[in-house]
Structure formats: structure tokens, C-alpha cells
Amino acid sequence: MPATDDATLAVSVVVPACGRMDLLDRNLDALMRQQFDPQRFEIVVVDDEPNHNTLHLVAGWRTRTLERGPRLSYVANSGPSGPASARNRGWRAARAPIVAFTSDDAVPEPTWLSEGLAAFQDGLDVVCGRIRTPVPARPTEQQRSARVLEEADFTSANCFLRKPVLERLEGFDERFNVPRGSDADLHFRLLEHGIAIGRAPRALVVHPVRPAPWGASLLQIRHAVFDALLYKKHPALYRQKIEPRPRWDHYLIVATLLLGLASLLMGLTIFATLAFAAWLLLTIRLCAHRLRGVAHTPAHVADLVLTSALLPPLAVFWRLTGALRYRVRFA
């Protein structure tokens, strides 16, 4: 590995890792193929689940690129786990004046660094590149949801920030200890501090969508608890950019279900029948909305049909849990 003086470094690339060896290996391969002087950038891999496998993978890449690659370092995240915490460990260990963030499951194009840095002009402190998520014409619901990254105003899978800005804002809020909320929170704080965000559309990162297990939406909905924290910190921006109004359809579905159960317990058969009929119609409406424009394979349709009955109660539970946990009026 060529000797790298701090004064020659232009950018530090921070890659949070969480035990996905094959994805991290692919990511490092893409970073080693950057069309950028290897003496002008470094790679900081932050292991969010410290283990020997990640350490050995990084060591293997360091050995193979000893003479021609950039400086590659391994940082174990010994603090609170989560992507926000890992990114904070990474940028604090970075030696360059600009920090580039990407993800272990992302694949930066060869010109990613050069195009991203070229966009730093006119006093810009923050630049966002472009994300491409390849999905089929008839995607699964998970794949369709992942495509929102292509239109995101800010994502840590492809962004560049001057280190003083990160120091000023104290980086990512580590209370968001899941892959939800921390990117939006930092984006909103940048906006609130009047920090302009430049665009580098040719700084491209490909973000393949991993296969999701059956019923994945039921596991992911628990992250909605952090929506309350994001709303508490940035109520106006939350309503402007994320959710203009509460998901009243979920609350209505839960209300009709509870009304039906209560009526049944009280022996009010007619009321129970009407309430359950309303619940069924609303659930069918939700399911039809989720099925629109996605793959209609038997397994995927069965997934959406069954989870449509369970999602509203879980969503309401986790949102109200967040409201109580963070002491905010949030629905």
C-alpha cells in the first residue's frame, strides 16, 4: 500500500459493515476500481458487528492492494450498534477534509469519487450523488419500496460532506439505531442550518435490492417507532417531506376491528357483523393498493394478502409506542 500523507488525502470513504461478507467484498472491489488517485483517498470500514470475519476480509484486501490501492483501515464499533453509530465512528476516524459515505451493500461506479468531488464548487459543503436500484418491470413490494432511494433528496448510501460540517452538526443521531430515520434527520438538520446541498448526478452508486424473506414487512414495521422521534425533532419538515398526514386508514382499520371485537363480547351481533364487514372491506382496499403494479406470483400475492391484515395493528402499535417513548403527540 503506498504511503499516504494526510496532506495529500482529498476524501475518506466510510463504509459501515454488519457481517455481510459477500456484500462488503463486492463493495470493496468497486472502491478499489475507482478511477481516482489511490494516494488521494482512504477507505474506513466500520464493523458494526465486530467479528474476525470482517477483520480478515479487510486484512485480505489490504494485503492484495498493498502496492497499488488506497489506504484501507478497519474500525470496530465498540459503542452502541446501528448504522448511525457506525458512520459516526467512521467519519471521526477519517483523515481527509471530505467524508464520502456509502453502504456495504452498495456498488459505487468507477467514477463515483471523481464525479462527487468535482461537484464541490461555489463554497458547497455537502454533495449528494445518484442512486440506481435495478428492479424488474413487475417488482416485489420490497423492490418497489427500495426504488424511493432513486428520488431521495439525501441518502447516506451516496453523499459527501466536509468534515467541519459533520463536526458542527455532531454527525448522525445515534438514537436512530436502525436503518430508518438517521438519514432524514441529518438532511433536515442541514436544511435547518441553511447548509446548501449540491447535486452530482454522475456520481452514481448502484444499490441492488436483496431478496426479502416472506413477511418482511411485518418485521420492518417495528422501525416505525422512530418516526415519532423524527417528527418530534422536525415536525414541519416531517409533514412536508415524509408524511403530509397520519395514516388514518390504518387507524380506521384498527378501530373497526376493535369495535367488532367489543360488540361481539357484548353480544351485539348486528354491530359486530357490520364492524367486521367494514374491517374486511378496508383491509381488501389496503391489499389492493399494495398489489397495484407489483409482481403477482402466488407466493408474493399470499404474502401481501396475509400481511395486509396484520400490518395496520402493528403499525398503529409501533407509532403509538414511539409517541409514548419520545413524549410527542404523534399519530
What are the roles of these predicted feature ranges?
Residues V178, A184-Q240:
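Catalytic donor/gating beta->alpha subdomain of glycosyltransferases that bind UDP-sugars
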Residues V99:
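Short aromatic/hydrophobic "clamp" motif used to bind/position activated sugar donors
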Residues Y74-A94, D153, A157:
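Glycine-rich, basic loop-to-helix element that forms the pyrophosphate-binding segment
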Residues L9-S12, E42, D185:
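Cell-envelope/extracellular polymer assembly enzymes that use nucleotide-activated donors
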Residues V107-P139, P208:
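Conserved donor NDP-sugar-binding/catalytic core segment of glycosyltransferases
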Residues M1-R33:
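N-proximal low-complexity "stem/linker" segments adjacent to membrane-targeting elements
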Residues D29-A76:
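Acidic donor-binding segment of Leloir-type glycosyltransferases
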Residues R144-L161, R168, N177-P179, D185, ...:
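A recurrent flexible, glycine/aromatic-enriched loop bordering the glycosyltransferase active site
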